[in-house]
Amino acid sequence: MDAKKFLTGGVAGGVTMFFLGFLIYSVLLDSFMRANGAAAAMKVEPDFPYLVLSQMAWGAVVTLILGHWAGVSTLAGGLRAGAILGALLGLAIDFELFATMNTMNLQATLVDIVAQVVRFSITGGVVGYVIGMGGRR
């Protein structure tokens, strides 16, 4: 994968992660997560520069794994690989946090894993599509 595909895939993935995160966590799951998590640990407003940086980094991670290592270059391939990546990352990160911190109860932890599968699957689809665009004429 060349630098242009990595950059465009990474940016597209980061933007997708950012907006899906807003939709899932701030719109759909806000009251549920506040009721089942440590509300005192949440900031009233997130530090957006760091949030954007985080989502761009996730976009780069998805692009590197799917585009460079797995050779994904289609929407369908990205959706599949992204779902697997989201499930593995969600399980690993959420259960580690559940085991070591008091930030969410088990119900919220399980819901968050499902949310990560959705986020990474759609992001993987976008990244796969964007990477594959260069091959079409």
Where are these regions (language model features)?
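Juxtamembrane/disordered regions of integral membrane proteins
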Residues: 1-137
